């Protein structure tokens, strides 16, 4: 493992969190050993006083590396990429790097917040199930349409070529959730669908899947 001899990293995670999912992929790609600490969001573990000391926002993921505590998935991934630079998660090519940042941003600000557990719970108090589903699906459809147009001319085996980069870490969990949680039809997004097929062939992505996490309900395994 890349962090052999160092204190083991600690990842506070929830099996179904797409934000934690993308960090698990990064850790797997880097070959890093870590302790998985489950935070059950449905039971409210994120509001526990001990966890709030680690992350005052009460969200996952949180990464603890010795005295360093990082609570945002993008910040965690960038921290890991700088501390453990192989394999790199950003391409040298400036244009491809910008595309990776754009894809990440679309997921981070345009799609994922609309299916965040806290947001969905709040919305459920205001509208019925059908309206909630339509609201979430609209955000996914809008985001996937933008991603398809962004990546159609630069994708290879993966989002921005034949190497795994930052965009792939954000796309894989989002597509997985869209298909398995929200039954999104991927036919209108052939580039994204092709990328997703490639992810399913990679051990680092397979091992990071929600249903393979230790806190996943047995019915999902």
Swiss-Prot record:
<keyword id="KW-0963">Cytoplasm</keyword>
<feature type="domain" description="GST N-terminal">
    <location>
        <begin position="7"/>
        <end position="88"/>
    </location>
</feature>
<dbReference type="GO" id="GO:1902000">
    <property type="term" value="P:homogentisate catabolic process"/>
</dbReference>
<dbReference type="GO" id="GO:0009072">
    <property type="term" value="P:aromatic amino acid metabolic process"/>
</dbReference>
<comment type="subunit">
    <text>Homodimer.</text>
</comment>
<feature type="binding site">
    <location>
        <begin position="116"/>
        <end position="118"/>
    </location>
    <ligand>
        <name>glutathione</name>
    </ligand>
</feature>
<keyword id="KW-0575">Peroxidase</keyword>
<dbReference type="InterPro" id="IPR004046">
    <property type="entry name" value="GST_C"/>
</dbReference>
<dbReference type="GO" id="GO:0016034">
    <property type="term" value="F:maleylacetoacetate isomerase activity"/>
</dbReference>
<feature type="domain" description="GST C-terminal">
    <location>
        <begin position="93"/>
        <end position="218"/>
    </location>
</feature>
<dbReference type="InterPro" id="IPR010987">
    <property type="entry name" value="Glutathione-S-Trfase_C-like"/>
</dbReference>
<feature type="binding site">
    <location>
        <position position="60"/>
    </location>
    <ligand>
        <name>glutathione</name>
    </ligand>
</feature>
<dbReference type="GO" id="GO:0005829">
    <property type="term" value="C:cytosol"/>
</dbReference>
<feature type="binding site">
    <location>
        <begin position="17"/>
        <end position="18"/>
    </location>
    <ligand>
        <name>glutathione</name>
    </ligand>
</feature>
<dbReference type="InterPro" id="IPR036282">
    <property type="entry name" value="Glutathione-S-Trfase_C_sf"/>
</dbReference>
<protein>
    <recommendedName>
        <fullName>Glutathione S-transferase Z1</fullName>
        <ecNumber>2.5.1.18</ecNumber>
        <ecNumber>5.2.1.-</ecNumber>
    </recommendedName>
</protein>
<dbReference type="GO" id="GO:0009407">
    <property type="term" value="P:toxin catabolic process"/>
</dbReference>
<feature type="binding site">
    <location>
        <begin position="17"/>
        <end position="22"/>
    </location>
    <ligand>
        <name>glutathione</name>
    </ligand>
</feature>
<dbReference type="Pfam" id="PF13409">
    <property type="entry name" value="GST_N_2"/>
</dbReference>
<keyword id="KW-0216">Detoxification</keyword>
<feature type="binding site">
    <location>
        <position position="46"/>
    </location>
    <ligand>
        <name>glutathione</name>
    </ligand>
</feature>
<dbReference type="InterPro" id="IPR005955">
    <property type="entry name" value="GST_Zeta"/>
</dbReference>
<dbReference type="GO" id="GO:0004364">
    <property type="term" value="F:glutathione transferase activity"/>
</dbReference>
<keyword id="KW-0413">Isomerase</keyword>
<keyword id="KW-0808">Transferase</keyword>
<comment type="function">
    <text>Acts a maleylacetone isomerase. Also catalyzes the glutathione-dependent dehalogenation of dichloroacetic acid to glyoxylic acid. In vitro, possesses glutathione peroxidase activity toward cumene hydroperoxide and linoleic acid-13-hydroperoxide.</text>
</comment>
<dbReference type="InterPro" id="IPR004045">
    <property type="entry name" value="Glutathione_S-Trfase_N"/>
</dbReference>
<dbReference type="InterPro" id="IPR034333">
    <property type="entry name" value="GST_Zeta_N"/>
</dbReference>
<comment type="similarity">
    <text>Belongs to the GST superfamily. Zeta family.</text>
</comment>
<dbReference type="Pfam" id="PF14497">
    <property type="entry name" value="GST_C_3"/>
</dbReference>
<keyword id="KW-0560">Oxidoreductase</keyword>
<dbReference type="GO" id="GO:0004601">
    <property type="term" value="F:peroxidase activity"/>
</dbReference>
<dbReference type="InterPro" id="IPR040079">
    <property type="entry name" value="Glutathione_S-Trfase"/>
</dbReference>
<keyword id="KW-0346">Stress response</keyword>
<feature type="binding site">
    <location>
        <begin position="46"/>
        <end position="47"/>
    </location>
    <ligand>
        <name>glutathione</name>
    </ligand>
</feature>
<feature type="binding site">
    <location>
        <begin position="59"/>
        <end position="60"/>
    </location>
    <ligand>
        <name>glutathione</name>
    </ligand>
</feature>
<feature type="binding site">
    <location>
        <position position="112"/>
    </location>
    <ligand>
        <name>glutathione</name>
    </ligand>
</feature>
<dbReference type="InterPro" id="IPR036249">
    <property type="entry name" value="Thioredoxin-like_sf"/>
</dbReference>
<dbReference type="InterPro" id="IPR034330">
    <property type="entry name" value="GST_Zeta_C"/>
</dbReference>
<feature type="binding site">
    <location>
        <begin position="72"/>
        <end position="73"/>
    </location>
    <ligand>
        <name>glutathione</name>
    </ligand>
</feature>
<dbReference type="GO" id="GO:0005737">
    <property type="term" value="C:cytoplasm"/>
</dbReference>
